[in-house]
């Protein structure tokens, strides 16, 4: 029997955590092939839970440092839009003229593509391996906005060489079993003089302790990731590509600027309970099932086990 001094909220909280852990341990999403990645994103898209909580940007946000003496935090969804604008600025895509062509590799349901087309005048082609994501991206895109979407494998792009003025890819690399092939395809379709903008979840260099190895295994097996590259490793893959043409790749670490996203993604369920409850009991269980992985991601990025790498470069003419 539980001690009578235990408050009901504590008992309920412990029960919810136990349920979340049970679902998490029994329902892994190990990477098996490109089809397993497509299936995972098809499920995440059709159940609408991720979209209800994260909006139409299925990536982390960029949080500006508050002004001195102020502690107000950025809104989760506003931070996601800010991420797009910050990566555009950092990679100098804002120097390209309206009408420039841009390929979004791993476009999700098209949130970034729509900003890039609407706010910068790019002609965007977005690709994803998930048919459900592409269907949803098309349905969310207003008529007249210069965005096209297609189901395509990032490791075998069905696109001509040197066909885009810019190539953009955010948080897609973790799902790629062949990082060199991924780098090669990004640069193959980039025109001479074109700009590259990539963001990636990276593991740190160096050996890991036993606990860190356990965490890393969970981060791989829960969300269909075959392996994480290091920042230096992906930089090397890009620079040594036969399509790089002596291209210099610059990098930065945005771990701190993106870190609040993980806890905010859980907090969205508290801020918008109707978003989950309106989808029914299955969505509630699904939300619980994702929570341990999100918490481990936060821990990994907070401690430096994981890093949020960004990569930019201009392909020589």
Residue ranges and their predicted role:
Residues 155-166:
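A short acidic, Gly/Pro-enriched loop at the edge of an enzyme's catalytic core
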Residues 64, 77-98:
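Conserved alpha-helix/loop element of class I SAM-dependent methyltransferases that forms part
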Residues 166-178:
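A short SAM/SAH-binding and catalytic strip from SAM-dependent methyltransferases
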Residues 209-305:
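Substrate-binding/catalytic lobe of Class I Rossmann-like enzymes that use SAM or dcSAM, i.e.
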């Amino acid at each position: 029997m539980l001690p009578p001094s235990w408050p009901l909220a504590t008992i309920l909280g412990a029960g919810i955590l136990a349920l979340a852990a049970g679902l998490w341990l029994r329902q892994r999403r190990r990477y098996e092939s490109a089809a397993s990645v497509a299936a995972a994103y098809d499920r995440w898209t059709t159940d609408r839970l991720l979209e209800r909580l994260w909006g139409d940007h299925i990536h982390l946000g960029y949080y500006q440092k508050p002004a001195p003496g102020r502690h107000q935090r950025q809104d989760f969804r506003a931070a996601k839009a800010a991420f797009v604008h910050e990566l555009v600025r950092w990679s100098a895509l804002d120097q390209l003229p309206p009408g420039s062509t841009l390929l979004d590799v791993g476009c999700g349901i098209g949130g970034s593509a729509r900003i890039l087309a609407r706010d910068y005048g790019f002609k965007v082609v977005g690709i994803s391996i998930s048919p459900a994501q592409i269907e949803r991206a098309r349905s969310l895109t207003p008529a007249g906005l210069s965005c096209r979407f297609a189901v395509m494998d990032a490791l075998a792009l069905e696109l001509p060489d040197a066909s885009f003025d810019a190539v953009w890819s955010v948080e897609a690399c973790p799902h790629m079993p062949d990082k060199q092939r991924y780098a090669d395809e990004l640069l193959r379709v980039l025109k001479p003089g074109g700009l590259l903008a990539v963001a990636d979840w990276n593991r740190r260099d160096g050996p890991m302790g036993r606990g860190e190895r356990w965490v890393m295994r969970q981060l791989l097996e829960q969300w269909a990731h075959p392996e994480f590259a290091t920042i230096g490793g992906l930089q090397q893959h890009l620079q040594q590509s036969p399509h790089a043409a002596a291209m210099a790749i610059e990098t930065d670490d945005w771990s701190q600027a993106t870190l609040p996203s993980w806890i905010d993604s859980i907090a969205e369920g508290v801020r918008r309970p109707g978003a989950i409850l309106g989808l029914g009991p299955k969505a509630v269980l699904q939300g619980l099932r994702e929570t341990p992985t999100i918490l481990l991601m936060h821990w990994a990025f907070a401690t430096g086990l994981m890093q949020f790498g960004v990569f930019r470069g201009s392909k020589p003419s």
